[in-house]
Regions:
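Short secondary-structure boundary/capping segments
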Residues: 1, 9-10, 18-19, 69, ...
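Generic short beta-strand segments
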Residues: 62-66
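N-terminal strand-loop-strand
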Residues: 1-27, 56, 60, 85
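Conserved Nudix-box catalytic region and its N-terminal flanking loop in Nudix hydrolases
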Residues: 13-50, 54
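Charged phosphate-binding loop/patch that engages nucleotide di/tri-phosphates or the phosphate backbone
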Residues: 121-141
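NUDIX/MutT-family hydrolases
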Residues: 92-127
Length: 141
């Protein structure tokens, strides 16, 4: 059995995480399917730019899991990366693409009350921890 691979990015701006509301009325991290010939790091950066208008530098892998999309009874491998806004981007408001109903910036505490898959919560918590510890650009071992 094979599964599609979705590469997602956790982006923080001023202690708020960037999330997008999808057509299932859930909040999710920006990102998309890994295409042939593309590295996961390239995928994260170009998907975030397409979906929000923000340019980022891709950081370390945060998590990987198999996600069951119950509404359509399918499984997707999700890989999350930390991502850092490029210089000058923190002054721009993110803009939701046609793929999403809404874009939002949420505090770590606010994330707990959102309809959001558990794997995304783990990734967000991991990136907050690494960012506050000053290790956001360190590669994973």
């Amino acid at each position: 059995m094979t599964f599609p691979v979705s590469i997602k990015g956790v982006v923080l701006r001023a202690d708020r995480v960037l999330l997008l509301r999808n057509d299932r009325d859930e909040w999710e991290l920006p990102g998309g399917r890994l295409e042939v010939g593309e590295t996961p790091e390239q995928c994260v950066a170009h998907e975030i730019a397409e979906e929000t208008g923000w340019r980022v530098t891709t950081g370390p892998i945060l998590d990987c899991w198999l996600y069951h999309v119950a509404q359509v009874d399918r499984h997707v491998v999700v890989v999350t990366y930390g991502a850092t806004l490029e210089q000058g981007q923190d002054e721009l408001a993110p803009v939701a693409s046609a793929e999403h109903a809404q874009v939002g910036l949420f505090t770590h505490a606010e994330v707990e009350d959102l309809p959001l898959p558990a794997g995304y919560r783990r990734s967000i918590a991991a990136w907050y921890a690494r960012s506050s510890a000053g290790t956001s650009s360190q590669p994973t071992e």
